[in-house]
Amino acid sequence: MRITVIISCILCAVFLCACGAQKVSDKKVSDVSFSVVNEEDIPETLLNAIEEKKMEPFKLSYSDNNDLYLVVGYGRQPTGGYSIIVDELYTTENTIVFATTLNGPGEKDIIQEAETYPYIVVKMEYLDYEVIYK
């Protein structure tokens, strides 16, 4: 009897673990059409979340049921002159992959001597996929 209970527990554990595992594919299926959102066009709820998080590097997503907004912030920087490049935005079988790069000010740039909090917000069509930030 005791062996039957132990075997049943092991089988249940294996079954439950297998059901919870979802394979995350990194194979690119298609590029995603997107636009970079100006600050005045960011939904208020999202803008408030950005303001709360901007001191430290952060990543977040926000949906209004029609569009999906992806945000990457690079935290406090000592000067102005930073820009953010979208390296990749594409889908796999079950994920959205979003990769960005922070570029610092150039040697010849006129630099604002004040702390800045660079972030980028992109808007794309809503997809119910997990977002992977790179």
Walk through the language-model features, giving the residues of each.
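Exposed, flexible binding/inhibitory loops of compact, secreted disulfide-stabilized domains
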Residues: I3-S8, A18-K134
